Amino acid sequence: MKRKLDANDVPSPEAADKKEKKEEDDADFESLNLDPRLRQALIKEKFTKPTLVQAKAIPLALEGKDILARAKTGSGKTAAYVLPILQTILQKKATDPSFKATTGLILVPTRELAEQVQNVVTTFAAFCGKDVRSVNLTQKVSDAVQRTMLADYPDLVVSTPARVVTNLGSSALSLENLTHLVIDEADLVLSYGYEEDINALAKAIPRGVQTFLMSATLTDEVDTLKGLFCRSPVTLKLEDKDDQGAGVSQFVVRCAEDEKFLLTYVIFKLQLIKGKVIIFVDDVDRCYRVKLFLEQFGIKSCVLNSELPINSRIHVVQEFNKGVYDILIAADEQEVIGARKSKKSKETEEAGSSDEDEGEPEDKSKRRKVSGKEKDYGISRGIDFQNVACVLNFDLPSTSKSYTHRIGRTGRAGKTGMALSFVIPKDQHGKHRPTSTATSKHDESVLAKIVKRQGKLGHEVKPYHFEMKQVEAFRYRMTDALRAVTRLAVQEARAREIRQELIKSEKLKRHFEENPEELRQLRHDDELRSARVQPHLKHIPEYLMPAKGKKGLSSGDVGFVSFRKQNENRIRKAREKNRGKGNGRKFAGVKKKVDPLKTFNRGRK
């Protein structure tokens, strides 16, 4: 395109944003001068062009500069710091092949994210042979095994801060030769209760270490980490306008508390949503209540929460990404419980922070303590869920910030997605006690902040209207199913699931590396069978079906239908069969004849 001439017939300078965009379009991995083995891994994984954060961060990282980058989850932040670290390790090994030391440390807030980062490192180091070794310290292994893993000085260590401090205390891990430090999801590390561990690490890490702070938001916690670890960092505030949720259609439904279950049943039974769905709920109990409710109608789903063993949680995410399961019910516990905050951040909040990011204050009596199990669990941030068609906020989050992170699980990598949220009007709160939650009291005020925040990003949260006349026809079936899902049934389901997953977790750890075929036998969406299942609820009578939905759910060829039930006289037939064998029921007052020619036992006189 020709540029306009000014008064002196000189072409006007090219606009800065256009120039920047042109540079981004021209950028490729070849221009980054990476090691051929890394480029080979990129080609294998079909990485053609670097994302915005990769194009900006990798050249700066290769120059040795500290980096503070803000970019949304799914923008390629992991590769932006893994590739420069691997490049430096390979260069060091090229000059000194016998060099052995831990030179890279990657800190993450959760075990799930640690496993994900470890997989990325393994993928990019696939062609590096024995030149690059990495260890994930969050794996459930004994201290003796972990000490053995660290004794060989792995080049790269991926861990939560707590595990690093533990191994430093036992002298199993040495950071004397550390050259790279990464804190991924930096805004979560302090809020997840790692403040003491971070302060201990700040004293143990040598000076002059190159630091990467990666975060989706720049908060007070990130500023604290910046002061502890960084030396004049380059700050990258990257907002790819093409990737800021533009592909996510956002809808909200105002409904009563029990109608959440009714609408969920209708959505899945009539297949109103095609593809994979993540259902976000408040806590673990809610997780199993929704799962047991869906089981009543023969709808399979799997759960993800902090109570499950780490191997099982990782396996659930992997299988969900492969398309083995279509419905994942996730307990967003950290968001509901309230992250543990430092004294400084508490004072900042009390002074008054942006109303966009703050939820409604929760009564102290209703807050639960965060257990050690929950400390390193998080699902709405960092985890790379693939090809998610819809995010269903069964329970609305308490902040607009959390809402943004939840809906970020869909519409990733240029694809489209949908976010549907259930909102309880204030006058409906507490009217159906069995399904009521404390957080729904503030749904309307939180929704107002969500709409405001999304409006600033140029997105609209639209109301979604169901044809309630048709939906109401299903209410009696929903009521029957919900009545069967009692509090006792939920508790039994939790205990049963944990027992099953513990067994599976051990097998995953010890056995399945040698027998990968048997992985198919492990299903996380099996029925829990703790609630009374009513078989008739699994089928929809034709008179309940909406006119438009009949074709999609029924085929023209009905096939053979027997006049009588196949199992009609099952018990009677079994009884008759056993009676023929001499095992039948003995009726009171009736003596059985004894043939003296067949037995030596004489009957009583």
From Swiss-Prot:
Residues 247-469 form the Helicase C-terminal domain. Residues 1-30, 339-373, 564-605 are annotated as: Disordered. A motif (Q motif) lies at residues 27-55. The keyword Nucleus applies. CDD domains: DEADc_DDX56, SF2_C_DEAD. Keywords: ATP-binding, Helicase, Hydrolase, Nucleotide-binding, Nucleus, Ribosome biogenesis, RNA-binding, rRNA processing. SUPFAM superfamilies: P-loop containing nucleoside triphosphate hydrolases (SSF52540). This is ATP-dependent RNA helicase dbp9. It comes from Aspergillus oryzae (strain ATCC 42149 / RIB 40) (Yellow koji mold).
